[in-house]
Every structure is written in structure tokens, then in C-alpha cells.
């Protein structure tokens, strides 16, 4: 009698993205990643010591399931760049590209494409599938949490530069994720610690802040993350929990058919929806495809124990479309690529001023 090798079940990506505590997977984390409700893992600076360790971690995460989980990170450039040492390129804050646009629009677009390429190529060489970038918020000069993460105050400039950045990401096989729909730039409060309120009417928001989402669409921006901001003249709930915003405006009115990620459900801006189960149910009910639960493994486990949801086939297919379509070169091969070398030199010029 021949012995049969035990194989992992083929689980489709679930609607919950979780994180991990350190630089290797614990037994509890391996168990959590095998939960059918899990569809992805978000990494933070605490998960990185060097490239070798990061590659080992991403390999372990991908091997946890027969159909690999989506591995994501907030890696925009400037102050939001989780991996900074051991060869990772220092990328400029996106506001620097906006300043360059004011002097030379074509040079700014070229540099944005090169920035996207370097960002994605380095992450993919280490096994990361997606960066939650670019920021599409308009720079009104009032939001400290957004600040120089925003390209520009003009929606048309934001659209052009984010399109160029997305092209660079795509050249390295990575999808783009625009955030924070419909716009976080007009409010001063930080949704990590407060519940921001934007008092403007819908027409004004659609004309200005949400315009890049309408102009870009899901072919250029395959994923979107709504803001934990309340727009009381539109809906009493934050955008990420609002069926009006996600299903009626983003999907139906703007015709968007990409992945919609909730922002982190443990943020203060999400507290208005209730406990962790209520927050997840509200986000998924509004039309989000995947919800993020960060920095609270206890809440992640609570949600995975309590959430009862049938993940729609359309959501599963959208998430699968975010996975890279071709294999990435390893780090050493990438370093010897002349195109990458040139793109990296351009970043160093703008970072150093």
C-alpha cells in the first residue's frame, strides 16, 4: 500500500487581512493563517531586520496555504516606508514629485514612474506582493497625517502623477492601491487616534477629492482603500462602513470594479461602528472585499472565531487579480539590471535635494 502525502486544502482568499508580530512566524500565527477567513497578511517595520530574514518570512507566509496569501505593506516613500535598511532605496515623499511637476511636469511624471518601479521591484524581490500606495488625497495643507504623503493640491496633478507611479508599479508586476477614498486631505484629525469629520457636500467632494478615482478607474488603480472619515452631508458612517460611499458612489456611480480594502479596523476612526465583529460586518456589508485587523492579534482571533460570512465569488476574483502575474527577479539579479540602477539613481537625486 502506497502512503499518500498529506496535502493542504486549496482555500480561496478570505475577507480578512491580519498581521504578524515579529520576524518569523509563531505556531499561533501559522494556525491563524490557515483559517479560511484569512486572505492576506500586512507587514510592518517590526517584521524587518534585513532582506534575508524578510525573504524567509514572506516564503513562510506564502507556503502557509496552497493558494498563497496576499502579502502587503504600507511602503509609499518619505516617512511611510517600512523597509529602509540593507539596500532598500530611500524614496521621496510624493509631495516632492508634486513640487517638481510645478517646474517640469514631464520630468515629474518620468520620476514618478521610476519611483513606482523601484518601490515595487525591491518589494517583489523580497516576496511582497502589494504596497498600499499611492495616496490620492489632495494637499490642502491641513492634514498632518497626510501632509507630504500627498502629491499636490490639484486633483488633475494627483491623477497624472499617480497614474505614472502606477505604471512603474505595474512594470515590476505590482498593482496599485489608491487611498483614502473619497479623500482625507481636507480634515486635520488623524483617524488613527480620532474620528475625523469632513463637513463638505457630496458635489464638492466628487468634483475635487474623488475626481482621481473617477478618472483613473480600476484598470489603472486595481485596489482602493476608503477613509475612516465621516462625511455627514453624505452618510453618518465613515466612508469605509458606508454602503452609500462604497457600493452606490464608488462602485455604481464611478463604475469601479477593483478590490476595496477597509483601513485598519482597530483605528480610533473605526470605533463608531462598534466592536471588531460589528466593524468587519459593516465594512463587508458596505461593499469592501477585505478588512484589515492590525496590531491586535486578540481581536483578529476574536473576529475569525465570530465572523460568519460567505465571501462573494466576485470579491475572491478581484483579490486574485491583485496577485503578481509574473515571477520577480531575486535581489542580486535586480541589482545588476541597468534599468533598475538608473531608476534608483534618479530617486537618490530627489531625496538628497
Curated annotation (Swiss-Prot):
Protein origin, superkingdom: Bacteria
Which Pfam families does this UniProt record tie to the protein? Glyco_hydro_3
According to the UniProt entry, what is the EC number of this protein?
A: 3.2.1.52
**Gene Ontology CC:** cytoplasm
Gene3D superfamilies to which the protein is assigned, alphabetical: Glycoside hydrolase, family 3, N-terminal domain (3.20.20.300)
Binding of substrate: at which residues? 74, 82, 149, 179-180
Q: Which InterPro entries match?
A: Beta_hexosaminidase_bac, Glyco_hydro_3_AS, Glyco_hydro_3_N, Glyco_hydro_3_N_sf, Glycoside_hydrolase_SF, NagZ_Beta-hexosaminidase
Coiled coil located at which positions? Answer: none
Name used for this protein in its record: Beta-hexosaminidase
